């Protein structure tokens, strides 16, 4: 029954065990037809359908118990219990300061093609809290019901092979709406858990490609968050970045190959004291946000007080920010819908590329990401055209981690980007 309700939690199992299908609190709906009264005999079938029939002239009696009604009521009770038992999430709108990090996250939600964000900063500065608070703001998307890869019914680029084959054969697939997933990748995850596994025995004996999807499949069209990404094994980081860049994950085992869409926003966070990522890996992240410790005493007091309020009564605290959260969510939805109409002038594109060239940025990722981030910011502000101010806001986050490190240079790389921007755009 737990699988029927779509949950395997112990709380759900406890409810089901304590609530029989014919309990008083959950009475079945009974529909009866009584052309005439009289004694009846009949049989009761599986599923709650009872058809008593009486012999005699013009006498007929049917009674149907709607078990689906009981199951729906139980599902609602389970859903409510699970929502109450989940760990409360700190509201995104309640995060004090850290504007650079919050802006990078919002721009990636608006345009996932920016390529994710790497957040580096001191310990205890709210990196993980801010990323996880983003889950409340994520918009809904259309998916194929029951598909483990969250296939997009309108875009074959993010469809699984099975879904594409069904569409080509003319099958009508059920479509539903669901919130964008946020998947946490633990540091101890194995490559099979991340990429998925192939059942070799079943493939050899039955000739069927039995694939068990991993975290990359679950994160398709969603967000994959890696806390302490600088401590993750290098080969796993390579797998994540390759999948994020190509949008596909390929699993090869014993001559059997399976590919599935894996287009996700990769968000990583870490403490620079624990080690830096390799430059070629840093370059794969679209944006880079630096988080520092708040030095203003008044702000520190406000952060402590807000956190104390949240710890005391999370539900009441979240309710106090409900209006701001909804406003921000509507702003994100509007920006996502308007993004395709936002334009950027050719001369601004030329100046962006000139900044990248004069800073000796390797490759063209810096140019591409800066253009996309500037368009996303313009959409967030409700405009259909990019301005130099938009570029000035995002270009340090798009280029600072792509500059070559000079051990003798004492100036922060973000400052170098800003100086070069004003030199070129002046």
Swiss-Prot record:
It is found in: Plastid, Chloroplast. Redox regulation; active in reducing conditions, inactive in oxidizing conditions. Thioredoxins f and m mediate the reversible reductive activation of oxidized CHLI. Its main location: plastid. It catalyses: protoporphyrin IX + Mg(2+) + ATP + H2O = Mg-protoporphyrin IX + ADP + phosphate + 3 H(+). Pathway: Porphyrin-containing compound metabolism; chlorophyll biosynthesis. GO terms for molecular function: ATP binding; ATP hydrolysis activity; magnesium chelatase activity. InterPro entries: AAA+_ATPase, CHLI-like, ChlI/MoxR_AAA_lid, Mg_chelatase_ATPase-isu, Mg_chelatse_chII-like_cat_dom, P-loop_NTPase. Keywords: ATP-binding, Chlorophyll biosynthesis, Chloroplast, Disulfide bond, Ligase, Nucleotide-binding, Photosynthesis, Plastid, Transit peptide. Strongly expressed in young leaves and to a lesser extent in mature leaves. It holds the Pfam family Mg_chelatase. Disulfide bonds join 104-195, 356-398. GO terms for biological process: chlorophyll biosynthetic process; photosynthesis. CDD domains: AAA. Belongs to the Mg-chelatase subunits D/I family. The magnesium chelatase complex is a heterotrimer consisting of subunits CHLI, CHLD and CHLH. This is Magnesium-chelatase subunit ChlI, chloroplastic. The gene is CHLI.
């Amino acid at each position: 029954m737990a699988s029927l309700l779509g949950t395997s939690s112990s709380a759900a199992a406890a409810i089901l065990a304590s609530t029989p299908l014919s309990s008083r609190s959950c009475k079945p709906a009974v529909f009866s037809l009584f052309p005439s009264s009289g004694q009846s005999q009949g049989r009761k079938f599986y599923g709650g359908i009872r058809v008593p029939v009486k012999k005699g002239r013009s006498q007929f009696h049917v009674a149907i118990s709607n078990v689906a009604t009981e199951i729906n009521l139980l599902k609602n009770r389970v859903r409510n219990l699970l929502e109450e038992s989940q760990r409360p999430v700190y509201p995104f709108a309640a995060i004090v300061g850290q504007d650079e990090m919050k802006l990078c996250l919002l721009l990636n939600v608006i345009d996932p093609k920016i390529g994710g964000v790497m957040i580096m900063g001191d310990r205890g500065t709210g990196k993980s809290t801010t990323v996880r608070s983003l889950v409340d703001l994520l918009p809904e998307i259309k998916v194929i019901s029951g598909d483990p890869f969250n296939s997009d019914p309108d875009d074959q680029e993010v469809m699984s092979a099975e879904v594409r084959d069904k569409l080509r054969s003319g099958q009508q697939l059920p479509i539903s709406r669901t919130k964008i997933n946020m998947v946490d990748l633990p540091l101890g995850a194995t490559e099979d858990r991340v990429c998925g596994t192939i059942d070799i025995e079943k493939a050899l004996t039955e000739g069927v490609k039995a694939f068990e999807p991993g975290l990359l499949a679950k994160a398709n069209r969603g967000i994959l968050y890696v806390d302490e990404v600088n401590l993750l094994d290098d080969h796993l980081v390579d797998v994540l970045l390759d999948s994020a860049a190509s949008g596909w994950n390929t699993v090869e085992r014993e001559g059997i190959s399976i590919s599935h869409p894996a287009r996700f926003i990769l968000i990583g966070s870490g403490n620079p004291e624990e080690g830096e990522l390799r430059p070629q890996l840093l370059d794969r992240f679209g944006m880079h946000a630096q988080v520092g410790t708040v030095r203003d005493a008044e702000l520190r007091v406000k952060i402590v007080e807000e956190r104390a309020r949240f710890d005391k009564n999370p539900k009441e605290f979240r309710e106090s920010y409900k209006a701001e959260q909804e406003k921000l969510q509507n702003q994100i939805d509007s920006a996502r819908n308007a993004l395709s109409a936002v334009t950027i002038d050719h001369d601004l594109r030329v100046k962006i590329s000139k900044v990248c060239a004069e800073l000796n940025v390797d490759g063209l990722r810096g140019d591409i990401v800066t253009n996309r981030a500037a368009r996303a910011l313009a959409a967030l502000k409700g405009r259909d055209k990019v301005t130099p101010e938009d570029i000035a806001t995002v270009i340090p986050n798009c280029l600072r981690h792509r500059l070559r490190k000079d051990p003798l240079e004492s100036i922060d790389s973000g400052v170098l980007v800003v100086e070069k921007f004003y030199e070129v755009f002046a």
